[in-house]
Amino acid sequence: MYDCYNKSFPIKTKYVTVKRLHNAWLTSGILKSIKRKCNLFKMYKLGTVSHETFKQYRNYLTQIIRTAKINHYFQIFTNFRNNTKKIWQAINELKGNTNKVNNTKSLQYNNSILNDPSDISEAFSRYFSTIAPELDSKLPINNIEPKNYLKGNFLNSMMCPIVSTFDVATVIKSLNNKKSGINDISLSVIKRNSYLFAIPLTILFNQSVSTGTFPSLLKTAKITPIHKSGPDDDPKNYRPISQLTIFSKIFETLMKTYLIDYLENKNILNPSQYGFRRNRSTFQALNVFSNDVFSAIDKKHSVLSIFIDFAKAFDTVNHNILINKMHHYGIRGSILSWFKDYLKDRLQYTVFSGEKSSTTTVNLGVPQGSVLGPILFLIYINDISYLFSEAKSILFADDITLYLTGPNQNQIVQDANHELEKLHQWCLCNRLTINTKKTYFMLFTTKKYLI
């Protein structure tokens, strides 16, 4: 497929003149006014205009620029009020916050200071590939089988999907133009020739599912280190951003449609889960939580809330446990074999300052940056809410809120500790780690004297 693409759409080099990019609010009129201000300043220095004349024009221009900025960002916040990503981009732009990608000149790793980009790339690759295994190795062995926590009997199995050329072409057209793959393949070319590419991809996908195999060429991820905060020579202060091939995204999107339909139609997903689901959002989760808190306060009861955070939850998913849970929920046969192969023998490499590291094998976690990863994680964590008998739970993917209500605060605390112990045992069994540094509790009460 890649050879066919390269022969049909060879890369050609063309030199173009790139104009300097300006802020969106910077109009041609404002640019002319800025030049006019600079000229007035020179004239003031030469004594041909008064300081008052220059000052009046400078203040006038400052007001124009301030108004232009206000109008620009007001337009953004109005047009994209339902698009949180765009809103935060605008906020970060206003604050001057930008992600630092590969800006560091050196890296401290294993008591050494690395300066060569190729060495830094290898260090990032080793660091990112060892985070999850190190977390997993610190967990003690638990004798409880994960299947003991599973509820329900699912005798019927998920049907093996068969897609048409139209289905594949529709998926291709729906792909985000801003998200490219890792093989120098132009998404715009594929989208403009969607039906041409859909024909072989339809055959390949149907054969892939029927044989229970996922193409090995689609299992490699490119990792880019993105600086979060803190010293930029510490690898702990970087977030790995993963990119997969465009064809992998097409295959995964096709499978995701069938998988979600099956999970939702069979009511498999826990109703307390609000993450990555149709017609569910953080607003709904917050609404449920708020109503329960207000209802308890009206009864003069107290509410103890525990906000639980997992350490690298998506990256530490145990593949064998996940596959067994999928089998329990009716995902069997060639489809289950397809998911097994999808998770097996995945590779990743890191790119820093144009230098590519060697590849490393990934044996834990759902693939980062993938289409299927979030849905697979929902399956993995699906049985967690059935643990609790005294506490209510609200989940948004890996973020869990437990809360207990009642008139007696001491009893609430006792019940909460009991529920947390059950959660601890579940985590040991399912190889997940609670991040105690980011796990908090909050007490809602009208009582004057607290516990």
Segments (PLM) and residue ranges:
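A glycine-rich phosphate-binding loop feature that marks nucleotide/adenosyl-phosphate handling sites
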Residues: 78-81, 145, 222, 435-447
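Secondary-structure edge/capping motif, primarily at the C-terminal ends of alpha-helices
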Residues: 37-48, 404
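Active-site palm subdomain of RNA-directed nucleic acid polymerases
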Residues: 255-273, 298, 374-404
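Conserved pre-catalytic core of RNA-dependent polymerases
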Residues: 128, 154-366
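Catalytic palm active-site di-aspartate
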Residues: 181, 220-223, 239, 273, ...
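Short, conserved micro-motifs composed of acidic
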Residues: 158, 354, 418, 433-451
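Catalytic palm subdomain of template-directed nucleic-acid polymerases
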Residues: 312-329, 401-425
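Basic/polar low-complexity segments
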Residues: 3-23, 46-163
